[in-house]
């Protein structure tokens, strides 16, 4: 610190050491923060951090890329600020912790924006050109928002999944997993959005309530004799009747190809007014009530006995096109929780149906698949051709009723799959797609993808720990990954496929590398414009370019390949130490990254996974436009300061929901002010202190100063332990307690008399300032990861010759001999002080004293308390902030008490103590003896406080 005082007020007759500081009481954050952002950028602070960290062990937090579309919202702020706290705290812990931000650039949302602005008929080359420009514009907007929040990083050189080198490396990653044998092409039901016109990833599906028709439908007997035999009857009692299914998707009935029963469930043949009905025995009573029928069980048989029986399609009498029969297959997935215990199977529209029919010998060409990509039936479908499936639902119900097959129809509200972009219902739809097989044995006969990924989960540290089971169960139960998409703005699956067989070209791996080289030079547009003959010559007569693009989750899911080991390999490394995202990313980026790394490397791409919750309002409700309870981080930053957002995030247990409201922000702001006031006190009282010139050796410090430094060092050890485990809210809570109670409520309160009234250059005052110097060093560094603007502002006052607080590491406090015993002793003293303060307050309330300095106290103490109190000698009064203090020994704790009496002496004009020696010097009648000594003689001697 400089030994120059700030401009001081006119000197009083008996001056005290009341110093000022350029660090203002009011933060004026909305005005000052943008100036710091500008200064950090202009002065290259991030680059200076990198230079200072060079050669240290690396710590890599890999940034999960936000999508390059739209303004940043509060969820973005939570995510980026948590990452910033981690990175800054790891740098200060002695690591080289770079932060390379990234953006996810391809995919549907941007393509939709281009369609909205320019229509759907743009040539592919123009779509790509405009998509690139749009993504670039969005990135620049978001970048400004993130920097405004105080996030330091390599903003000049972020990674973008649309950069040519990243696109090229993604194609190479695709080549890697093909080479290993994980990729296959097949017909399979996938999540399909009619509005997207494309398959969806699991992470792009959300569930919302929807009301649909629920129907019970009878499939009439096609083999009455065999059916009778299955139930142990010589013949069916009557010809009418059949087997009954229940479904909430009437639109799948035209595509029915089978019926599924559980092998062990007992099925009943029930005689009713509508004929003989086959229903699970335990569902008979409920179904009869639902169908408003009376029934008598004629016979029963387990499902296994009914296998391979055939029944007529329920629309067989309505149109010749439905004159087919459905076989009974057995499936363990059939239950009797609801419905009839019989499941109708349209294999083109359900994964379990598909697997069951495949297992029973159906080939891809056998599947009836009448729903087109836009959600309409093909024109040739009998009765319903050209209709959208949702419009067809009621017409199918009517047709079933007219055919005599309908037993019941009602409205049913259930949780149903929707597209996360369009918020519209989606279906499973069998299409020819490229898949990564979860249970495929790779060519090296190593572990399957599922096995490798589950091992990766086990090897990963999770924060919080419950994330492990969540990700494990998702991987354990997930279907094969649909890699392909039917879009334009995406990285191509740059294959050449045989026009007749659909087989890959035998030189596929070599060709992928050739395409990657071109993409590296010109982007994915190089594939669009490529004439196949350039690469495969005359083979172009037999092979054509595959038109599918890669799932965007493959884009971001391979950043461990094309960023950590690709575009930014000089700064980053594989595996990353930490991936940090919202808890939805267990099925998103965490998930896709784990799968791709398991295929390419046989391991997880991260050592640790940290998840945070979502933001909610003060009442725990999710933020939504309809509720009008959203909080805009820009608005809060411009009104209260980004520092308040940072402090709110750091002080909240992010493992659950993060609640925010005006009341919560008000409390955060009050907490901020307490920290700021502490810093202001420290800086003001160091403004005439130069460490090189004024520092006092540790062994010459007053005892309370040694205690304060020992206590602060112990606290720092605790805080760094929390930082290491990414536990930020205990860091904030303990620092707020430290500032308000340990410093403001105790140490600094005791120190004021010594700082203000001791001789300016006395050992007593310089001892206090030396301790404050160390405390300030320590405090600013542990605050810096989350209160970045304030710590930097204070640091520039405290260490003006230093570039930035962010190139520092956590402070090495000086060793204090016997620190543990000292901390224990002063904990006792603080406990006694609490009792004294309470007694003083009672005396003040009773009008026996005014301020605490008007009091003289006698503390009755026993044992260790007595020893601790007497060890302070006459300095005890300074600790208790009274004008006099004596200690009386008692036998035990039960006899301990505090006596308070008003001093009978005069008040010193300068120090405000009431002392017998006020006026002892005739020339200075209002001054006490110690103030006279401090001003005109050698000064008082203090040893403890």
UniProtKB/Swiss-Prot annotation:
Organism: Burkholderia ambifaria (strain ATCC BAA-244 / DSM 16087 / CCUG 44356 / LMG 19182 / AMMD) (Burkholderia cepacia (strain AMMD))
Protein name, as recorded: Isoleucine--tRNA ligase
PROSITE patterns recorded: AA_TRNA_LIGASE_I
Taxonomic lineage: Bacteria, Pseudomonadati, Pseudomonadota, Betaproteobacteria, Burkholderiales
Entry comment, domain topic: IleRS has two distinct active sites: one for aminoacylation and one for editing. The misactivated valine is translocated from the active site to the editing site, which sterically excludes the correctly activated isoleucine. The single editing site contains two valyl binding pockets, one specific for each substrate (Val-AMP or Val-tRNA(Ile)).
Cofactor(s) for this UniProt protein: Zn(2+)
PANTHER family from the UniProt entry: ISOLEUCINE--TRNA LIGASE, MITOCHONDRIAL (PTHR42765:SF1), SOLEUCYL-TRNA SYNTHETASE (PTHR42765)
Positions annotated to bind Zn(2+): 908, 911, 928, 931
Gene Ontology biological process terms, A to Z: isoleucyl-tRNA aminoacylation
Motif placement: 'HIGH' region: 66-76
